[in-house]
Amino acid sequence: MDTIININNNNQKYPQSAEEYHKVLCNYFITLQSAMQSTSRPSSSSPPSLPAVSSELLSSSFPTNAPESSSRDLAPKQNQFTINVVLFDEKKKKNPEENLPANGDQLATLRSLMMQINPSSPPSIPATSPQLPLAESENVPESSSTLKDHKFSLNTMLFNVKKNDAVKISLANQEQWAKFHEIGTEMMVFNSGRRLFPLLAYKVSGLDPHKLYCAGVHMIPDSAYKQEYDHDLQQWVNCLNQKKTIFKPTSEILGRIENGFKLMSLGIDMSDVKIFNIAIRKKTPLQIEKSRKPNLDKTIEVLIQYKYLPVIKIYELSNSGMEKKEIAQATFPETSFVTVSIYRNQKIKEMKTLGNKYCRTDRKQIVMEQRGELEQ
């Protein structure tokens, strides 16, 4: 059957123009149709009959200014339309019209003809020719996901931080923080700075033992409203008669640079983090800096009677240590606290005095004596 259909085996003269090539192609499909009808095959494997080629397709003419093609240029095109290539070559079946002239009615007629050759998987043919301009109605809408949520958009490449899911952070002293959180944690704030208690201590896993890392802590507001202590409820509540506060980003306190093995075995100790507040702004900047003592890089400025939440971040450092990349961050609700200038809840004051190793011994004795008197 190939010898009947293949143009190369019929000793025909190669077409000398695009118009002649088009007519030869149409005659080829007519010959293909008659050959497939005359060949007897089982009903399960026999392909559907081809429709008759429209007279419009045969009589259609190409533009007069169409460039003429030599027989050498058209020879490889003829080989692409043998029966084996059309029916069994998967690459050509995907888009058999790739090398055909895209000319209006001709392309539409050929498309319908090819879809009936293999109706189960019709070839994907572009609806418009590449040479034609895109119509206004075919413009991609702005809400299209291909434009809005593109994987390689500029915002994704610049601002999306890729987190390492293998890195896990947990609170080392979670039970202690939970006891304070049940009552309502308060943190005393001075101009010179004061350590947090309970201390910030974390456990981490999933790091590369040989790479260098460092941890950082900063504060975020846990409520936009100023807090007031309700003595009847014995807890802090939002002061709703005031406007919401716009917070400035707090500074970040960085820990020591360690390798992954040491951080995973010893944990992350951020006990040197302090918070401070400047109550009197009439002081000069030099007086303010002197009142805060030397460790300026370990203090975070906060507002009084506001609720804050510590944020822990882990950075992976380059070999030179000059560049860092954030790989994980975490917050824990039980570590939220209210900044105060004086303790309002006496239970919090007692727990801090007895549990804080930095508290003076005489203060601890006073609290223990008061507790003993209350028990008696």
UniProtKB/Swiss-Prot annotation:
Residues 171-364 bind DNA. GO terms for biological process: cell fate specification; dosage compensation by hypoactivation of X chromosome; positive regulation of transcription by RNA polymerase II; regulation of transcription by RNA polymerase II; sex determination. One of its GO terms (cellular component) is nucleus. PROSITE patterns: TBOX_1, TBOX_3. Its main location: nucleus. It holds the Pfam family T-box. Residues 38-63 have a biased composition (Low complexity). The keyword Transmembrane does not apply. Keywords: Activator, DNA-binding, Nucleus, Transcription, Transcription regulation. The keyword Transcription applies. It is found in: Nucleus. Residues 38-76 are annotated as: Disordered. Gene3D superfamilies: Transcription factor, T-box. SMART domains: TBOX (SM00425). GO terms for molecular function: DNA-binding transcription factor activity, RNA polymerase II-specific; RNA polymerase II cis-regulatory region sequence-specific DNA binding; RNA polymerase II transcription regulatory region sequence-specific DNA binding. Transcriptional regulator involved in developmental processes. Directly binds to the promoter region of the sex-determining factor xol-1 to activate its transcription. Its activation of xol-1 transcription controls sex determination and X chromosome dosage compensation to promote male development. Has a role in the fox-1-sex-1-mediated determination of sexual fate. This is T-box transcription factor 18.
